[in-house]
Amino acid sequence: MRWNLVCLEKKKGGLGVRNLALMNKALLSKWNWCFTIESEALWKQVISHKYGVEEGGWCTRAVSGRHGVGLWKAIKKEWLGMYSSLAYRMGSGRRVRFWKNKWCGDEPLCLSFPSLFVISLAKDVWVLDVWNPDGVGDGWTPLFSRAFNDWEIEMVERFMLKIQAFRVQREDEDKVVWITSKSGAFSVKCFILF
């Protein structure tokens, strides 16, 4: 009997056995989710101290070494798999990458506006660093390596309209959101159904 038939629900003609590989991925991904949202948890502090944290603090650095790292290495590996289902709800903008994180629509700005990303002077800049709170009104100040050509003006207008819908809230924390659930929170069930 084929494994995919065994894993089908009983009402669909299967045996109703859960796909263990998928369940394992979901449970490992749950650890990644907990790492992103539990900022003060003791276990997170221990893991962060042992492996280091990537800038922004959403996940640990890549795990290297041969001894004693197998479990966290497997958990970290699932971070890459779940990353496409994450978005960022911007608060202060201190932990969200302006070009590379998904905070302003369905994809990162570097994918929505690749030709602008190419001429950007700061490709790894944080959202807060592109936000200018000075002057008459708050505004965005992305820096580019050259003046825009005539044929690029319409694209720049679309770009500016897209980001102008968002404002940095300095007193609020940046948050991660699981986009496949209505609540924005990760769940094993939602992961499996996705």
Each PLM stretch: what is its role?
Residues M1-F194:
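A helix-boundary/hinge signal
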